[in-house]
């Protein structure tokens, strides 16, 4: 089911649990974000219209903006007239799959908001380095892929502070920084997760970061028997104890293994 790769949170569901078996993404206010359906074209248009009413003159001139040439070289230069529609530059590689993803995003944004208010332009780089675009901040939308080596929210969230390595938006978030500091100094693991959940929700609610996908691999095949590997596949022991299947697993067999795992997990948590 492709829906399984959609995600609203920075840290993945079913990857981090507290001592009582509670999923980190079930800590509020992160839980509400995880369970929200953000696909709402009508609301997107309403927000854009509200922004236009506040930031534009009656003739569509954007307040504080003048006609000029925007230098995004080596991506290109763009002439702007300081009026609606707002131009958004999406910069990506010339990889076929990435171009398709950019085209899909362009279609979704323009269909939801309307080309009368937004102009989504795609620029693909080839023959020049990533650093010539990313380092001088020559982008409006930055697509990034994050991974972590251990089952703790700090693996991702400490890299997204005001001075963090993954702060590609160059934002200043002292409130977020303070929550991260509280997380790292928490007295218990549960308290640590609570502060991290509040920090992660802060980034998501403020749209500093917009998570939307958990993996680009889609469907995949494996010889590993489900529920015999460690729950989170990190480190050099991630396959310790894993059973290897010689024959394909049917759906009914998978559901049987899943039911047995759920029972065993519930019983194990009672002993904690």
Could you tell me what each predicted segment is?
Residues 103-111, 127-140:
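Short helices/loops that flank or line small-molecule/ion binding pockets
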Residues 1-3, 31-37, 41-44, 115-130, ...:
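Extracytoplasmic/peripheral linker and loop segments enriched in polar/acidic and small residues
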Residues 1-107, 111, 198, 251-272:
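Append "and occasionally in soluble cytosolic enzymes with long acidic Gly/Pro-rich linkers
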Residues 87-90, 121-122, 140-144, 210-211:
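Structural recognition of the beta-strand scaffold that forms the well-ordered cores
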Residues 97-100, 130-133, 150-155, 221-223:
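Extracytoplasmic/secreted cell-surface and envelope-processing proteins
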Residues 221-272:
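Long beta-strand-rich cores associated with HINT superfamily self-processing modules
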Residues 139-155, 171, 215:
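Ligand-binding clamshell of periplasmic/extracellular solute-binding protein-like
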């Amino acid at each position: 089911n492709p829906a399984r790769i959609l995600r609203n949170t920075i840290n993945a569901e079913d990857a981090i649990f507290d001592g009582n078996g509670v999923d980190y993404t079930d800590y509020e206010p992160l839980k509400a974000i995880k369970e929200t359906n953000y696909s709402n074209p009508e609301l997107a248009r309403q927000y854009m219209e509200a922004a236009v009413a506040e930031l534009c003159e009656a003739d569509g001139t954007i307040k504080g903006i003048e006609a000029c040439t925007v230098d995004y070289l080596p991506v290109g230069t763009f002439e702007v007239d300081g009026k609606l529609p707002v131009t958004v530059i999406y910069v990506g590689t010339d990889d076929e799959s990435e171009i398709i993803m950019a085209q899909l995003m362009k279609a979704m944004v323009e269909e939801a908001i309307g080309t009368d208010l937004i102009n989504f332009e795609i620029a693909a780089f080839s023959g020049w380095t990533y650093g010539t675009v990313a380092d001088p901040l020559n982008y409006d939308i930055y697509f990034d892929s994050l991974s972590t080596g251990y089952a703790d929210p700090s693996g991702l969230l400490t890299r997204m502070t005001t001075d963090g390595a993954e702060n590609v938006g160059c934002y200043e978030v002292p409130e977020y920084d303070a929550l991260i500091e509280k997380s790292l100094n928490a007295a218990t693991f549960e308290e640590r997760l609570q502060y991290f959940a509040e920090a992660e929700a802060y980034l998501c609610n403020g749209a500093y970061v917009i998570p939307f996908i958990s993996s680009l691999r889609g469907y995949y095949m494996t010889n590993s028997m489900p529920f015999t590997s460690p729950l989170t596949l990190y480190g050099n022991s991630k396959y310790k104890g894993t059973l290897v299947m010689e024959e394909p697993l049917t759906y009914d067999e998978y559901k049987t293994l899943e039911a047995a795992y759920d029972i065993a997990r519930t019983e194990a948590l009672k002993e904690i």
